Amino acid sequence: SSAAAQTTMDDDAAPEGDFNSSSSEAAPSDGAYLGIEDVRVGSHDGYDRIVFELTGEGTPGYFVRYEDVPTQQGSGKPISVDGTAKLVIDLRGMGYPFDFQMEDFPSDSVKPTSTSVIKEVVGAGTFEGQTQYVVGLKGDKTPFKVFSLNNPNRLVIDFQSK
């Protein structure tokens, strides 16, 4: 695992680095204790983007990978999400919603209409310091990249679109 790339830019800025279909992993910063304020999905020229806006202290870690049948942490129950390929995102270094005066982190299904490859994003809860989301994609396993942004603190996943 490597340190997460840290960049300051707005949600629309084009990212650096290469797209890849293999799993991507990074450890959270020491003492990271984060909550999720917002989940946004957008379409850009050449890529679709998911932004997790965070609150709390530190930089998030993550484990992002494709799974044929995504299952919930802890329970092992299958997670239902629209799409052919399914990408599982575990955000690491997370607290629980009540620690941030929230009833829950954003978990409602997001079904964007303007995206090329993202069909649905579903929140699957927090368990032992990890908050899980599953992304359903149109078509095959789409190359992606994961990185962190500052001011505000965000974790970003970009999906290459045709």
Predicted regions and their residues:
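Short linear recognition/processing motifs and adjacent strand/loop elements at protein termini
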Residues: 2-162
